[in-house]
């Protein structure tokens, strides 16, 4: 079995109850092409959690997962570009995000061993 690792990323939503409800509605029916692209990239599991307007995404990836390769593949897929454009109206990068970065990688500060 391929070794995996967990990554956590954060993002804010526009602080508007109607937009947040619409964002959640879209995520109850993520397009099959989007799910397929996620899996092709080496992401085995993904969860998105929300409190207020803050999102945390937890992903389980293969050890050789390459975020840059995923971004390149996503940019070449018209359906994923369409999904990302749709989601962009809801999302706000964190102040700590690098220029052009949407989901900001989080640093693990504790692990119960």
Question: What positions do the PLM features span?
Answer:
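An amphipathic, aromatic/His-enriched active-site/gating alpha helix that lines ligand/cofactor pockets
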Residues: 41, 62-102
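Beta-strand elements of well-folded, non-transmembrane domains
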Residues: 13-15, 63
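Short, glycine- and small/hydrophobic-rich beta-strand elements in well-ordered beta-sheets
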Residues: 35-56, 60-64
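Eukaryote-biased recognition of C-terminal alpha-helical segments
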Residues: 104-110
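Short amphipathic alpha-helical segments
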Residues: 19-43
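Active-site-flanking beta-strand signature of metal-NTP-handling nucleotidyl enzymes
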Residues: 6-12
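Ligand/cofactor pocket segment of small-molecule handling proteins
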Residues: 1-2
């Amino acid at each position: 079995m391929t070794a995996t690792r967990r990554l956590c990323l954060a993002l804010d939503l526009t602080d508007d109850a109607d937009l947040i409800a619409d964002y959640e509605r879209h995520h109850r029916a993520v397009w099959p092409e989007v799910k397929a692209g996620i899996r092709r990239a080496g992401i085995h599991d993904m969860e998105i959690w929300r409190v207020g307007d803050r999102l945390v995404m937890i992903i389980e990836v293969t050890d050789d997962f390459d975020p840059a390769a995923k971004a390149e593949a996503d940019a070449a897929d018209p359906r994923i570009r369409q999904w990302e454009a749709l989601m962009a109206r809801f999302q706000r990068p964190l102040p700590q995000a690098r220029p052009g970065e949407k989901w900001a990688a989080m640093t693990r500060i504790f692990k119960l061993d």
